[in-house]
A protein has these predicted regions:
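N-terminal export and membrane-targeting signals
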Residues: 2-30, 203, 277-280
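C-terminal motif of bacterial Sec signal peptides marking the signal peptidase cleavage site
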Residues: 35-38
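Short, low-complexity N-terminal intrinsically disordered segments enriched in polar/charged residues
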Residues: 40-71, 75
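Short beta-strand edge/turn micro-motifs at domain boundaries
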Residues: 42-43, 134-177
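Short solvent-exposed beta->alpha transition segments
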Residues: 77-121
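A short hydrophobic beta-strand element
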Residues: 122-134
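Juxtacatalytic substrate-recognition/specificity segment
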Residues: 181-301, 331, 390
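Acidic/His/Gly-enriched intrinsically disordered linker/tail segments
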Residues: 252-257, 278-279, 295-421
């Protein structure tokens, strides 16, 4: 889910179980004996080293290590967490994770060993899948759930790495972060990405913008900033490159769209960071509407979800229609008026004219608000979020059919294309 002003250049993959063969070392003594006896022309005897096997792993010890990390996180004990690191770098990261979870107010943090994934290194370290849960205390009632890859060393007594592979890598576990928390906004940003103070201010302004239309339900917002576009894909558990050109995505904190799960805004620093202040604020406000109304878990029409979010975000922005609807106006001048309202395929991030489609969806909601008022638009949106039949709701609440709405919207498109022509 993205804003019309966020330009687009536009289930979990199975883990590959790898079996590695390690080169054997040659016994110097045996080789010397062979040379002395005049057998140097034959292949020397090679004494194989022991190949690490999953039979040698210590999952019980790893589970105990996870329990210790979980206690450290719950007790805000950075020193105890650092002691679990396999090296200085990992020790520092584990300590910083404790500090970040404390600053963000994460609650219900659990880490449970599930199974090894078959990747064993020569020194006996291995990677396993760990079930993690967490929620932002005071903001969310239900916890997020994700499978996260942990690498263990020293017979499971130390943690060597967190994240990677096909599992989810939550931002708060994937590296050092900068955190800001107020009464209504939490920002968790990978260190060195976007200025946390600026993101916090934009998120707070997004609540103000949303409250003008949504009222008191525009109460709290959680924003996460992964270290890169690839890290955003990892945080959501999706294929690499899925949202490379997208400024922001709103979805479950664990990448899922399960109803009731915490919903967060994720910013792509490689795109969002290049936006000018006004477009950046529009994007943040747009995504905030999705989060505040739990839109990702809704089965409502995409044009309504995206169009309404842009309606709220652009409502009080002083931008001309040539800017907010310039792409769809040009498309109408070139190809004529679309026959139907924007489809989900039109609004897909990889669609060829997705920018124009978002503008078109916004104009559908503008059309409804201009004919029936903003309160009527909000009631219609809420009914659709609740699963109501769109045609029946439109007729019952507003006295229109989808055909009536489409015709009025087409008139709006003709009007803006003429003005811009």
């Amino acid at each position: 889910m993205r804003s019309a002003l966020a330009e687009v250049p536009s289930v979990r993959r199975p883990v590959r179980r790898a079996v590695r063969r390690w080169a054997a070392t040659v016994s110097a003594g045996l080789l010397a004996a062979a040379l002395i006896s005049g057998c140097g022309g034959d292949e020397p005897y090679v004494a194989p080293t022991q190949v690490p096997s999953t039979d040698d792993l210590q999952p019980a010890a790893a589970a105990t290590t996870l329990d210790a990390l979980q206690r450290a996180l719950r007790r805000d004990d950075a020193d105890a967490a650092s002691a679990l690191g396999a090296d200085d770098q990992m020790s520092a990261l584990l300590g910083s994770i404790v500090e970040s979870t404390t600053a963000a107010g994460l609650d219900d943090v659990t880490l449970r060993y599930i199974t090894e994934n078959g990747q064993v290194s020569p020194d006996g370290a291995w990677t396993a899948t760990v079930a993690a849960t967490w929620r932002v205390g005071g903001f969310e009632e239900r916890a997020a759930h994700a499978d996260v890859a942990f690498a263990f060393a020293d017979d499971g007594k130390r943690i060597a790495h967190i994240g990677g592979g096909a599992d989810v890598t939550p931002v708060w576990l994937g590296g050092t972060t900068d955190v800001r928390r107020t009464d209504d906004v939490v920002v968790i940003a990978a260190t060195g990405t976007l200025p946390v103070a600026s993101v916090l201010a934009e998120a707070q302004e997004a609540l103000v913008v949303a409250r003008r239309v949504l009222g008191a339900r525009a109460d709290r917002l959680v924003v996460e900033v992964p270290s890169s576009a690839a890290a955003m894909d990892a945080a959501l558990g999706i294929d690499r490159g899925s949202y490379a050109g997208v400024a922001a995505i709103t979805t479950g904190a664990d990448g899922s769209t399960v109803p009731g799960r915490p919903v967060h805004v994720f910013l792509n620093p490689e795109v969002y960071g290049d936006l000018e202040p006004v477009p950046a604020q529009v994007v943040m406000s747009h995504e905030a509407v999705h989060a505040l109304t739990d839109a990702p878990a809704s089965g409502a029409e995409a044009w309504l979800l995206e169009g309404f979010a842009d309606y709220v975000a652009l409502r009080d922005v002083d931008l001309p229609r040539s800017r907010t609807a310039g792409q769809i106006a040009e498309q109408v001048r070139r190809d004529g008026v679309p026959d139907t309202l924007p489809t989900r395929a039109d609004l897909d991030s990889q669609a060829p004219h997705v920018g124009a489609a978002y503008e078109a969806a916004w104009l559908v909601c503008v059309t409804l608000a201009e004919h029936f008022g903003e309160d009527a638009l909000v009631r219609f949106y809420d009914a659709a979020l609740g699963g109501a039949d769109l045609e029946r709701t439109l007729r019952g609440q507003l006295g229109w059919t989808i055909a009536d709405l489409t015709a009025a919207w087409q008139d709006e498109l003709i009007s803006i294309s003429t003005v811009g022509g």
